[in-house]
């Protein structure tokens, strides 16, 4: 009887371990999917609003700007340590309604700089993730935008 109980418990543990969420995509694999569907780098992008954002890989975010305009934004700096756990972020730009290279993104008090911005074919990303049985990322809508005075202050 004891052997049967142990066997059943082992089977139950194995079943629980194998069920539930689909396997989590490795961050490098995840980033590769997004990079395959991203266009060439742009120096800056004009937007009306940043509707949503989510972290991708180790040091990138996707911004949904307006309706169905998505951009893969690669960051450099310490903020990437908090991207996965952040619920909000702040974009600090030198021009109103424009995000560009060298602008800042602040996550939990840590500042990163925008290294590159690339237009993203999100429908293709979504299709590839769904084909592989992967879940879509959780989107966050908490984005603060600050425009700093870019004037030189000179004569």
Which positions does each model-derived feature cover?
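Sec-dependent signal peptide recognition
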Residues: 1-9
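Residues embedded in well-ordered secondary-structure elements
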Residues: 5, 50-52, 106
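Extracytoplasmic/secreted proteins and extracellular or luminal domains
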Residues: 9, 43-46, 110
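N-terminal secretory signal peptides
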Residues: 17-77, 81-82, 140-152
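Residues that line or immediately flank small-molecule/substrate-binding pockets and catalytic motifs
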Residues: 8, 57, 121
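Helix-rich interaction surfaces within compact, conserved domain-sized segments
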Residues: 77-155
